């Protein structure tokens, strides 16, 4: 089966190569070899890598190399972790720049080389990586997901590893802080069982439970009025109209498609779940 990641490395081998070739100047072989592999994959996948993209890869590999060298010196078992570059999440058409497979946890990383701030758009992108892996990636089921936005030149930011429910909030780090955050993630969520990189890389697409099961989980005996205070004022009216249309379609043995529109956060999903549940 074709790999989804454009390049993968065991952390131990990657760190050894990094340590042997890194001199603090120029481009270490560990960087050059990975970038050449990424270039080969980009050509094979008909992706036109610009000069800017190549430079971003070079700097990303440098940052990750420094971070993992730090982690390997602090965390027993970290050499058995894996690092993947440009991983294509099944059917989601998005690629985290880097994914770290630790022992019991997954860290998708959005790399922003040279960025001096943590933009909301980048934050949302990192959050999407975490949600997509949790909701659609079979081999990530049961693992803790910690999405990271690494703006390499940005100021330090606080770390908050509270998990809700199995994916933490996005961690904001710069190049100097990435290694320490990975160490903290292991300290809080690490197990003694490293993730099988090949199996994870080739994971099947596994969507979230069907809408009926989700509705049952969400409502749990509650009525829409009891949990809709944060949504649109006309949510109840919307649900009532959906139910009216559904009832009419049943009575007439018709098939009907209903389209519910609204701004983000207005309660469209909740309206659909409520209509199905009731």
Regions found by a protein language model. Name each.
Residues 257-269:
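Walker A/P-loop nucleotide-binding motif
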Residues 218-227, 254-255:
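Short glycine/proline-rich turn/loop motifs
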Residues 269-277:
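Motif I (Walker A/P-loop) of helicase-class P-loop NTPases
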Residues 235, 264-265, 275:
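Non-catalytic interaction surface on structured domains
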Residues 236-252, 273:
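Pre-Walker A adenine-sensing motif
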Residues 1-212:
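Accessory nucleic-acid engagement/destabilization modules that flank
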Residues 224-237:
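Dynamic helix-loop-helix/coil hinge segments at AAA+ ATPase domain boundaries and subdomain interfaces
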């Amino acid at each position: 089966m074709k790999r989804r990641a454009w390049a993968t490395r065991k952390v131990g081998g990657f760190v050894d190569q990094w340590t042997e070739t890194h001199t603090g100047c120029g481009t270490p072989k560990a960087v050059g070899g990975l970038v050449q592999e990424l270039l080969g994959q980009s050509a094979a996948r008909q992706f036109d890598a610009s000069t800017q993209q190549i430079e971003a890869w070079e700097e990303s590999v440098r940052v990750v190399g420094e971070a993992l060298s730090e982690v390997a010196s602090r965390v027993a078992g970290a050499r058995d972790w894996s690092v993947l570059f440009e991983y294509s999440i099944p059917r989601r058409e998005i690629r985290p720049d880097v994914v770290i497979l630790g022992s019991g946890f997954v860290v998708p990383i959005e790399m922003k080389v040279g960025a001096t701030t943590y933009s909301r758009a980048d934050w949302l992108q990192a959050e999407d990586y975490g949600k997509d892996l949790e909701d659609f990636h079979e081999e990530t089921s049961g693992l803790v997901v910690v999405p990271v936005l690494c703006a390499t030149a940005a100021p330090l930011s606080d770390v908050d590893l509270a998990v809700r429910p199995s994916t933490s909030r996005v961690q904001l780090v710069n190049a100097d802080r990435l290694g320490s955050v990975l160490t903290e993630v292991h300290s809080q969520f690490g197990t003694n069982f490293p993730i099988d990189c090949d199996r994870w890389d080739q994971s099947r697409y596994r969507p979230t439970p069907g809408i009926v099961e989700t509705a049952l989980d969400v409502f749990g005996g509650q009525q829409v009025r009891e949990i809709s205070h944060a949504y649109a004022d006309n949510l109840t009216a919307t649900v009532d109209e959906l139910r009216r249309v559904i009832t009419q379609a049943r009575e007439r043995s018709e098939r009907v498609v209903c389209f519910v529109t609204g701004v983000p956060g207005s309660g469209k999903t909740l309206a659909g779940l409520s209509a199905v549940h009731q």
